[in-house]
Amino acid sequence: MAEYCDIYNEAGTHLGTALRSECHGNPALIHCTAHVVVIHPENGMVLLQKRRMDKDIQPGRWDTAVGGHLAAGESFEEAARRELSEELGVSGRVELFHLFDSRIRNEIESENVRVFGAKLSGPFDFQRSEIDEVRFFSAAELTDPANRQNFTPNLCTELDELIRSGFIRS
């Protein structure tokens, strides 16, 4: 089944829809994604997912625990909750809190990203068709340059914002 995303101009005006597959590979198609930073409620560690080696983009690298494109007509929060369920098997009542918004612009795609936080400890029934592994990382591990070589560029940008805002203390 074809998946469609709403597309926007730089000013945020809705222009229509495009196939999700078209949004990757065409940076002119600005679309939206929702990410969820999962924080362990007891120790503050941050959950990351390791992308499968057969992924088209950033295979085998550590990434934000939850992230996905908004389907056409879907809100950021609806997408975040859907992705929590699909990627980590988490459903039901989960408190999401807004952390920040960002823009990702590169040669592959252009995304407007809303980043939420959620305090969860697991267990997680992660989506094995997309994810090889999930695990919690300490602040020291998240800021270690040796580890960052194995993180996606988007994750590094997100972590830098979380550190800058004091949400993660290095």
Regions found by a protein language model. Give the residues of each.
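Residues that flank catalytic or metal-binding motifs in active/ligand-binding sites
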Residues: 3, 32-34, 66, 112, ...
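Short, structured loop/turn "capping" segments at alpha-beta junctions
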Residues: 90-97
